[in-house]
Each structure stands twice: as structure tokens, then as C-alpha cells.
Amino acid sequence: MNKLFKQIAGVAFAATLGIGFAPQAKAVEVQEVISDGGIRAWLIEDHMNPLMTMDIAFTGAGASTDPEGKLGLANMVSGLIDEGAGEMDSQTFRSEMENRSISLSFDAGRDDFSGSLTTLTRERETAIDLLRLALSEPRFDDEAVERIRAQIVSGLKQAENNPRDIASRTFFASIFGDHPYGRQPSGTLETVAGLNANDFRGFVRRAFAKDN
């Protein structure tokens, strides 16, 4: 997996080459960048600000792939993988991002698992390394797991009586029935309560691969 993230890093660094100032009236140019390992990316250069933004997505790794009885798995992983990674616990990892003005977030949709990274160009090496750690060496410490679980459970309880959430659940269930799209990405109170670190690690091994 580290080889995969070296390839991703190579693509990301391409976005920071040739720093300068582009004419304001210049049309946006989208470039296709392919790493030596086959990672395909689409690059838009804008040199007006010293920032690098990168969005990634793993297709076929969304909530619709959650195993029966473990609904909400992808969603919970999206809330956990930036809560400590490698040698850094949650507080240390978060402090490193905050001190360097690095923004890192993840989301699990029905079809894919996505992430977004924004950093000052001078902090790009640290930012890419934090992204690599989050995706390849998340810790899933007990404190973070229970804190994120409590947040999800609170949201599920609120959604039980929220008209918009009720309408959404009813719509997807009526349209898709027993198909995985008919399930709610956040899972249920029962399934979320049963998720554990082994489930999260299994998801990471399965989902975060170049083939996705």
C-alpha cells in the first residue's frame, strides 16, 4: 500500500510545479496526469494562491458495499481514519494538521469513499504524509472509536424523528427495496453498536487499493 501512496504523492506534487501567476482571463485547462504506477488524475493549475488541493475517490468502496449486519461501516471509517494514524494518536494527529493549516476530510457515499486535502504548498510533503498515514495506518484507538460512535448514534436518534430524514429513508426504500441502495449509509443503531476495530481494519484492506 505504501507503494500506492508514493504514486499518489507523485501525482499530487505535479500540482505544485511551476509556481507563478497566470493571467486572470486565461481559460481553465484540465490536464490528465498518470503516474508510473498507473494512478490517473486530473490536474487544474491555478497559481494565484500558494495552495494545493487534492480530491481522491475509491470507487466500489461506498456504503452500498457494507456487509449485511455491519451497515454504517464505511461511514464510521470515514469519521475515524483521521483520528490518529501511525505513531500519532488522535490529539497529536489533529494538532499536526491544525498547526500546519492542513485540512483533511473523508466521506462515504453510496458508491465510493472519497477524501479531500487542502494545504499550503510549503506544507505539501507533511500533508501528503498525513494523508498516506490516514489511509494506510489508521489506529482505531478505543477512545476515538467510542467518541465517533457516540456522534453517529446521536445523529441516528435525531434522524428518527426528522421529517427530511424520514422522507429520504422512505424514498430510497420504496425505490430500491432490498437493493443496497435502499439502505441508509449511516447504518442503524443496532449495526453501529456492533462495529469494532477488526471491522474497520478489514474495510481499509479491502477498500483502499489502486483497483478501486
What role is predicted for each listed range?
Residues 2-4, 13, 34, 42, ...:
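Charge-rich, well-structured scaffold segments of protease-associated domains
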Residues 5-6, 74:
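Residue-level micro-sites within transmembrane alpha helices that shape
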Residues 8, 24-25, 139:
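Generic low-complexity segments that are intrinsically disordered, proline-rich and/or Lys/Arg-biased
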Residues 9-20:
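Bacterial N-terminal signal peptides
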Residues 20-96, 114-121, 125, 129-132, ...:
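His/Glu-rich zincin catalytic helix
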